[in-house]
Amino acid sequence: MKVTNVKIKKVDGDKFDRLRAYVDVTLDDCLVIHGLKLMQGEQGMFVAMPSRKMRNEEFKDIVHPICPELRNDITKVVQEKYFALDQEQEAVI
């Protein structure tokens, strides 16, 4: 599967500690996954899959890639798009 479209909604860094953006990803122009999050971790940015809080207060992914290659592709494309938005905004200012 290939990432064919990415939509990013940046969030205010002052209001959210680690959250950088909400993300929607389209795969093969056939499947859209809403509710991904671009997070800042101790070892860099990563994409958190959509999740639901369970009764025991634990979070479970609603959807997630089974193969690491797809997860890496999603992360790479999302980060590239996020940083491209940063550069576009800096050019406008």
UniProtKB/Swiss-Prot annotation:
SUPFAM superfamilies from the UniProt entry: SpoVG-like
GO biological-process terms attached to the record: division septum assembly; sporulation resulting in formation of a cellular spore
Cited Gene3D superfamilies: Stage V sporulation protein G
PANTHER family listed in its UniProt record: SEPTATION PROTEIN SPOVG-RELATED
Function in brief: Could be involved in septation.
Similarity remark: Belongs to the SpoVG family.
Protein name, UniProt field: Putative septation protein SpoVG
Species annotation: Fusobacterium nucleatum subsp. nucleatum (strain ATCC 25586 / DSM 15643 / BCRC 10681 / CIP 101130 / JCM 8532 / KCTC 2640 / LMG 13131 / VPI 4355)
